[in-house]
Amino acid sequence: MVNVPKTRKTYCKGRECRKHSQHKVTQYKAGKSSLFAQGKRRYDRKQSGFGGQTKPVFHKKAKTTKKVVLRLECVVCKTKAQLALKRCKHFELGGDKKQKGQALQF
């Protein structure tokens, strides 16, 4: 269980700052993939018509988790940076701090 606070004071690479300042933390989420990327256009063209599946479908998945990526936005200059954390099964943003001697809760 990884619990990350919603704000953190860290170095800002922005041209105005270039010093440690407060950052707002959110979790990175991949955007919607474009239908007009060259590979997708080629794939759709190949798939159309008769003949079933034309390219191999990947089945040998090895990983059970993904790396968590944090998106840090500077409060002063609004510059965004990304920071990758280690792999974890449970990730929490701004959760309660854990007390000593209490059971884990998901």
UniProtKB/Swiss-Prot annotation:
Cytoplasm is among the record's keywords: no
Protein name: Large ribosomal subunit protein eL42P
Species name: Candida maltosa (Yeast)
InterPro entries: Ribosomal_eL44, Ribosomal_LSU_eL42, Ribosomal_zn-bd
UniProt KW keywords: Ribonucleoprotein, Ribosomal protein
Miscellaneous remark of the record: Cycloheximide sensitive type.
UniProt family annotation: Belongs to the eukaryotic ribosomal protein eL42 family.
Gene Ontology biological process terms, A to Z: translation
UniProt keyword annotation of Ribosomal protein present: yes
Molecular function GO terms recorded: structural constituent of ribosome
Any Gene Ontology CC annotation: ribosome
